[in-house]
A protein has these predicted regions:
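TPR/TPR-like (Sel1-like) alpha-helical repeat modules
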Residues: 156, 196-203, 227-250
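Conserved alpha-helical positions within TPR/SEL1-like repeat arrays
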Residues: 12-22, 46-60, 87-102, 129-144, ...
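TPR-repeat structural position
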Residues: 24, 44, 64, 71, ...
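Amphipathic alpha-helical segments of tetratricopeptide repeats
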Residues: 32-37, 75-80, 114-124, 157-164, ...
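Short coil/turn linkers that connect adjacent helices within long alpha-helical scaffolds
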Residues: 1-2, 40-43, 80-84, 122-126, ...
Length: 251
């Protein structure tokens, strides 16, 4: 470790190891340790990286106060470090927007998504995985607000980008599953279209065109309840079983 900086690569490697094992206790301890180290060293950039991971972790753990506290400090650091017009800042905005939307503050979230989108458009980076992730997350917020046409447009654009980029079949599957929900919410008689979207999502979930790591296990667990919701319990259980096997392989 440098005298005044945390080793970000080591932090990410260790945190990824916790997620690959699906060990949330170790993940929390890892985040807390590196956050304390960054604060001790006065390493604002390192702290921003750790806090950004903390935002996502506490959101997934449904720890609202911790997630929002980490989010607010992250946004303050973006201002302090002069990153408001940068792609690094856009990454923070997307995570913050997703968190606000998750906790019912969708309109605030949309403003941050739009701010992040401006960074990618200005940098001519709208055919990237990162921009597709923005579109996916913004679509979810638009869907919550029942702005179905806009949500559908965002998800479809994200899918097309991810297909071009390659190696993100899990994320494509999530988008297709969410489109199935949107289709059903907009018209609950659209059974054939819903089934077609789920069939396509299932194919992407079982594709070999993705790493079988902790993120893959997370994708499977994220999609499983939707297959159950649409009366496909055997597929839902299969997704959970494979997710468990992936995590166990890292232990």
């Amino acid at each position: 470790m440098d005298n005044d900086r945390i080793n970000i690569a080591r932090f990410i490697e260790r945190l990824d190891g916790c997620f690959n094992r699906n060990n949330m206790k170790e993940a929390r301890e890892c985040i807390e340790y590196w956050e304390n180290e960054a604060r001790r060293l006065g390493d604002d950039r390192g702290l921003l990286t750790v806090l950004n991971e903390a935002v996502g972790f506490y959101r997934r753990s449904q720890k609202k106060s911790r997630a929002l506290r980490a989010m607010e400090e992250s946004l303050s650091l973006v201002e302090k470090l002069g990153l408001t017009q940068s792609l690094s800042g856009a990454t923070i905005y997307i995570n913050a927007a997703t968190t606000l939307s998750f906790f019912g503050r969708e309109e605030e979230g949309l403003r941050l998504y739009d701010k992040a989108a401006e960074c990618y458009i200005r940098s001519d980076l709208t055919e990237t995985y990162e921009y597709a992730a923005l579109l996916n997350n913004r679509a979810g917020t638009l869907n919550e607000l029942k702005r179905y046409d806009e949500a559908e447009e965002n998800w479809n654009e994200a899918i097309e980008i991810l297909k071009k980029v390659g190696y993100h079949d899990g994320e494509i599957a999530i988008s297709l599953v969410m489109l199935a929900h949107l289709t059903f919410d907009r018209d609950n008689t659209s059974y054939e279209k819903v089934e077609a979207l789920l069939d396509e999502a299932w194919a992407y979930l079982n594709s070999d065109n993705q790493a079988k790591d902790g993120n893959y296990a997370y994708v499977l667990r994220k999609c499983a309840p939707s297959f159950e919701y649409f009366q496909r319990p055997m597929e839902a259980q299969a997704l959970r079983d494979v997710a468990r096997e992936v995590n166990e392989a890292y232990r």
